[in-house]
């Protein structure tokens, strides 16, 4: 069974937990934010592995607890960089699919590490048994750093 099929089966089995079909939601939707409520996510992995006595980790843990206590479903603010990414991510996914020779790079809203639902990832695409994270830099600086110097932002 592929990563995609396993992830979608896992989500479908959790439909009664959420009260909606988690296989049909999109990343960034209110339902997706609810699914991430109080969950350690790969997007903040740098905060977790930083060490237990670091400010970044302590702040992240406090945010997770606050999110649960206050039922805060995440940052609702929009940034032009986020809007840019949402606009160009499908194009980047299509280009990656063509470059790698895969007919289709599928999207998964979110998948949990296990039934505890405490750790999750939201890959931008899945093909075969590989997950990918797609970046569509807002400005050319990061793209040029990567292309010319093989530099990638640590949080990526």
Predicted feature residues:
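Charged, glycine-rich intrinsically disordered N-terminal tails and low-complexity linkers that flank
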Residues: 1-87
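Mg2+/Mn2+-dependent nuclease catalytic core
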Residues: 80-82, 92-93, 99-156
């Amino acid at each position: 069974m592929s990563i995609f099929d396993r992830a979608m089966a896992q989500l479908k089995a959790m439909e009664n937990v959420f009260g909606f079909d988690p296989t049909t939601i999109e990343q960034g939707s209110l339902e997706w934010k609810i699914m991430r409520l109080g969950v350690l996510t790969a997007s903040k992995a740098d905060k977790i592995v930083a060490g237990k006595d670091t400010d970044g980790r302590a702040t992240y843990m406090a945010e997770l607890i606050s999110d649960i206590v206050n039922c805060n479903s995440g940052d609702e603010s929009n940034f032009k960089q986020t809007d840019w990414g949402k606009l160009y991510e499908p194009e980047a996914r299509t280009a990656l699919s063509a470059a790698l020779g895969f007919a289709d790079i599928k999207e998964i809203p979110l998948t949990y590490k296990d039934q505890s639902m405490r750790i999750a990832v939201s890959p931008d695409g899945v093909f075969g048994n590989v997950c990918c994270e797609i970046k569509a830099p807002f400005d050319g600086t990061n793209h040029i750093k990567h292309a010319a110097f093989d530099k990638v932002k640590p949080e990526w």
